Amino acid sequence: MPENTIKNLNMLLVEEQALLRRTVALTARSLGLGTIHEAANMEAAERLLREHSFHGAVISIDCGSLPNCTYNLALLDRVRKGLYASNSGIPIAVMAENATAELLSDLRKRHVSRVILKPFRARVLLDAFASFEPLAPHKS
């Protein structure tokens, strides 16, 4: 992809681990991938999604290893319904510790473009951001 095509992309990273967020955001900027806006939790992500238009997002949906834990996919649903400033069809990748058949089915229904299983290297996130197509960031 030509450098000028991806240089101005605004992307969202929702991840509770501060070191991982900072590493990915700074590396993406230095590689010319665009600007990574960071959110440590869903509330911060919603605030950013209301205020900014994004070309793509990588969202951690960790459930942990708790028994009978269900993944919270409400943020994905709201993005896909067009309730935020971004185009409802933006590419979304999710990070999770486990990927059951049920979760993968739920993510497929929400048009999630990539599932990243933890643990992983920061490079995997950078590759996910680099793969996002530069869609129009605003709703039609």
Residue map of PLM features:
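CheY-like receiver
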Residues: 2-5, 135-140
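Conserved acidic segment of CheY-like receiver
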Residues: 8-19, 24-28, 57
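Alpha4-beta5-alpha5 "output face"
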Residues: 29, 80, 105-109
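Acidic, metal-coordinating helix/loop segments flanking the phosphotransfer/catalytic sites
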Residues: 38-56, 63-66
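Conserved phosphotransfer microenvironments
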Residues: 56-86
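Alpha4 helix (beta4-alpha4-beta5 surface) of REC/receiver domains from two-component response regulators
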Residues: 70, 74, 94-114
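C-terminal output helix
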Residues: 120-129
